[in-house]
Amino acid sequence: MNSLRLEPISRVAGEVNLPGSKSVSNRALLLAALARGTTRLTNLLDSDDIRHMLAALTQLGVKYKLSADKTECTVHGLGRSFAVSAPVNLFLGNAGTAMRPLCAALCLGSGEYMLGGEPRMEERPIGHLVDCLALKGAHIQYLKKDGYPPLVVDAKGLWGGDVHVDGSVSSQFLTAFLMAAPAMAPVIPRIHIKGELVSKPYIDITLHIMNSSGVVIEHDNYKLFYIKGNQSIVSPGDFLVEGDASSASYFLAAGAIKGKVRVTGIGKHSIGDIHFADVLERMGARITWGDDFIEAEQGPLHGVDMDMNHIPDXAMTIAXVALFAEGPTSIRNIYNWRVKETDRLHAMATDVRKLGVSEEGDLHYITVTPPTQLKHAEIDTYKHHRIAMCFSLVALSDIAVTINDPGCTSKTFPDYFDKLASVSQAV
């Protein structure tokens, strides 16, 4: 296994321009494929998850042209649901942003599709979504364990009418239904949410992209979603993929801990995990908001006790910032960490203990109490890109840190460590 030793960083300063958002990129690609007309996507993320979506779209008969640097993609929309004459086997890696929405979208058309991926994908639940789709006429069969991929979709279309979606496990279940809803007939559904909807900013991302594609969806405090009738997905022409607010969190955290960093490609009107900056501000960092940037500057940091369900990705970075804060930090209402690309709660708890950090928690929270002195540790990333990136911040202390399998950042941010080095000054 490859590893990367990061030597202590004395200070960070500078500006980082963000790559496109993974969540936005894959949603936009799927909608562009289904839309009437041609869509030009710019600032597309070039990463493993996006490559899996593009490969799937190719197998589904979608034509597109990718620029040499893979950040611009012109997609020729089908203007209809997917239809194939022979069975198609789609390998989706560990990309939940491809697996869940594609599962629903494929049910709208015709043909037989096998959806599978890496071993971890077989541990990521999809049963709530499949159950809802089955109530609307979907024919889906599990190939191994009930409730989990791999699975086979025998597509024959979906019925309309009201549906109840469990929002407590993953917002991607709701996203999948929202993206499929305009094509459901004869009655466009109302979507009722069971439980407390997790990761609401990611639903805002879905609603924004669908609105750009001609589909207006309204909601009642995230409890009931209304899709107006007589709407169809149409190309927006040009669509700019916004920077990844979750990726911004590492650089904003670095500025809050030891210097001053400006991140461009997102701003005060952005959606997604930008509320991470609000948490940094509550911890004592100085935050400046612009239309197209967010800047974080070092301040005396103190621990917080907060519900961070709305920022599930960036909350991991808060666990790393907590190592530099005065007093304990409690990150609450994060049960859905356990059903991400890896069991994030287990991974975070295991790795912070290696650093000499006092940690406690259960299925729903983690509390981190920093020691007087961190210890050098080899951080196991569990093939999880965000674990690699958030633990890189340990180098902002006076000890080095070793990141095992640093290449796992290719899922969302292939050149992350180069970008970190560009704003870092060695001790």
UniProtKB/Swiss-Prot annotation:
The keyword Ribosomal protein does not apply. The gene is aroA. It is an enzyme of class 2 (transferase). Phosphoenolpyruvate binds at residues 22, 96, 124, 172, 344, 386, 411. GO terms for biological process: amino acid biosynthetic process; aromatic amino acid family biosynthetic process; chorismate biosynthetic process. It comes from Aeromonas salmonicida. Keywords: Amino-acid biosynthesis, Aromatic amino acid biosynthesis, Cytoplasm, Transferase. This is 3-phosphoshikimate 1-carboxyvinyltransferase. Catalyzes the transfer of the enolpyruvyl moiety of phosphoenolpyruvate (PEP) to the 5-hydroxyl of shikimate-3-phosphate (S3P) to produce enolpyruvyl shikimate-3-phosphate and inorganic phosphate. Its main location: cytoplasm.
